[in-house]
Regions:
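Extracellular beta-propeller repeat domains
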Residues: 2-419
C-alpha cells in the first residue's frame, strides 16, 4: 500500500475506496461540517447511544464502493466492550459485531485501531484480550460472523497490536505490536517486550518480521505502517533510538531495519521533536511527514517534521503552546500544494476543556508558517482531538475528539481550503 501525495490511502487490493475518516467524540454528539471554510456550520450525522449501540469510536473509517463507512468502537455493543459498525448515511448506523471480554466469551474486545477490508467485503482488525490477554487479529464476514485469525501470546510473537492493519494484494496483513518480541528489556517492569513488526497470512499464520531491541533501533512501534513500491515498510517507535525518544524506521523485504532518524528531546542548542505518536505519510518523492507529541520548544509542545529519503530531518514547525496549539498526537494530511494539516490536543485559547485549551485544527504551509484553522471551544464543536485528519479530493477533512463523559459520540468534519 502506497500513500499518495494527497494522503489518499490505496485500498485497491482490498476493493475499498480511498477514504479514511476519523470519528469525533464530543459531549454534544455533533458532526462538524464546514462549507465553506470561512463559514463553518455544524451538523449531527449520528449520535452513538451506548450499549447495545456503539460507544467511544476511536479508529479510522474505511469506505466501500457503495459509500458505506466502517469502523470500530472501544465501548458499547451487547456486552459493553466494543463493536464493529457500519454508517450508511445520516442517522443510519448498524452494529455489525459486539465484542466480549467476559470469561465465558473467550474472545476479547475494546478495538481501537479501525478496520481494513478486502474485495469480498470482509473486514480485518485488532482488539485487546484474546486467549492470552495480549491482543488478537480478527476477520469479520459481510454478514457479521467473526473469526479470530491469530491470538498473540505475549512472548516472541508480540503483544498489544497498535495501529490499523495494512493488507497486501495476496491478503496478508501487516502491523505493529507495541509489546512482546524477543527482547524483554522494555516497559515499566522490563518484562513487557520491546515490540515487533508482524505479518499474519490468510490462514492465520503469524511471522515476526522484526524484533525491536529497545536500543538504537527503537522500541514500542506505534501507529500504522506505510509501504512503498519496492515493498519497504516505514513506521515509528514511541521510545528507543540513539537518544531514547523514539525513531522513524524503514524495514526492507528481508527484515533488515534502518533507523532513518532518532529523536532527541530538548537539550542546550537542540530543538528536535520527541516521541512520535501518529501515523506517518509519504509523498511521491519518498519524503515522510509526521508529528511528535513532545519536544520542540522549551515547554516540549511538539513539532511537525519532514524526513527525506536519506533520513535528513527538517523541523517544519515547533508549537509554541498558545493559540497555535499544544501536543499534536495524530498524523498529518497533505494537499497537492504541499500544505500539511493536523490537530493538536490542547492549546487554542479556549480553556473550557482543560487549563491548556481545547485543541486546534492547524495548517502548516511549505514555508513553515502555521495557521490555526479552527480553535475548539469545548462546546458544541467538541474539544481535545487526539487523532489526525483525513482530506479527500474535495478538501473535506475529519478529526476525532474526546470527552470526559465518553457517552455520546459523532464524526467531526471540517472543510478546509486547499490553498
Amino acid at each position: 500500500m502506497i500513500t499518495a501525495p494527497a494522503h489518499q490511502i490505496s485500498q485497491e487490493a482490498q476493493g475499498f475506496a480511498i477514504t479514511v475518516l476519523f470519528l469525533a467524540i464530543v459531549l454534544a454528539s455533533v458532526i462538524v461540517a464546514a462549507r465553506p471554510a470561512q463559514a463553518q456550520m455544524f451538523e449531527v450525522l449520528y449520535s452513538f447511544q451506548g450499549s447495545p449501540d456503539a460507544s467511544g469510536p476511536t479508529g479510522p473509517f474505511v469506505r466501500d464502493a457503495a459509500g458505506n463507512f466502517f469502523s470500530t468502537s472501544a465501548g458499547g455493543g451487547t456486552f459493553g466492550q466494543g463493536t464493529a459498525f457500519k454508517l450508511s448515511g445520516p442517522g443510519k448506523e448498524t452494529v455489525l459485531y459486539s465484542f466480549c471480554l467476559q470469561l465465558y466469551c473467550h474472545e476479547g474486545g475494546n478495538p481501537t485501531a479501525g478496520l481494513a477490508g478486502d474485495t469480498q467485503g470482509n473486514l480485518y482488525g485488532t482488539a485487546s484480550g484474546g486467549s492470552f490477554d495480549t491482543g488478537f487479529v480478527f476477520q469479520l464476514s459481510p454478514t457479521g460472523g467473526e473469526v479470530v485469525l491469530y491470538n498473540f501470546t505475549g512472548a516472541a510473537d508480540g503483544a498489544f497490536p497498535d495501529g490499523r492493519l495494512l493488507r497486501d494484494a495476496e491478503g496478508n496483513l501487516y502491523g505493529n505490536a507495541a509489546g512482546g518480541g524477543a527482547y524483554r528489556n522494555c516497559g515499566l517492569d522490563n518484562a513487557e517486550g520491546c515490540g515487533v513488526v508482524f505479518k499474519v497470512t490468510t490462514t492465520g499464520t503469524e511471522a515476526v518480521l522484526y524484533n525491536f531491541t529497545g536500543g538504537a533501533d527503537g522500541a514500542q512501534p506505534v501507529g500504522a505502517l506505510v509501504r512503498d513500491q519496492k515493498g519497504n515498510f516505514y513506521g515509528a517507535t514511541l521510545t528507543g533510538g540513539k537518544y531514547g525518544y523514539g525513531t522513524v524506521f524503514r524495514l526492507d523485504g528481508g527484515g533488515n531495519e534502518t533507523v532513518l532518524h532518532s529523536f532527541r528531546l530538548n537539550q542546550t542548542g537542540h530543538s528536535d521533536g520527541a516521541n512520535p505518536n501518529g501515523d506517518l505519510i509519504r509523498d511521491s518523492k519518498g519524503n515522510l511527514y509526521g508529528t511528535t507529541s513532545s519536544g520542540g520548544n522549551l515547554n516540549s509542545d511538539g513539532v511537525v517534521f519532514k524526513l527525506s529519503k536519506t533520513g535528513k530531518e527538517t523541523v517544519l514547525y515547533r508549537f509554541q503552546g498558545g493559540l497555535d496549539g499544544i501536543i499534536p498526537l495524530g498524523g498529518l494530511v497533505r494537499d497537492l500544494k504541499g500544505n500539511l494539516y493536523g490537530t493538536t490536543v490542547y492549546g487554542g485559547g479556549y480553556e473550557n476543556c482543560y487549563n491548556y485549551g481545547c485543541g486546534t485544527v492547524f495548517k502548516v504551509d511549505t514555508a513553515g508558517r502555521e495557521i490555526a484553522l479552527h480553535r475548539f471551544t469545548g462546546g458544541a464543536d467538541g474539544g481535545n482531538p487526539p487523532g489526525g485528519l483525513f482530506r479527500d479530493a474535495q478538501g473535506i477533512s475529519t478529526a476525532r475528539l474526546p470527552t470526559a463523559a465518553f457517552q455520546r459520540t459523532a464524526r467531526m468534519a471540517a472543510e478546509l481550503s486547499s490553498s
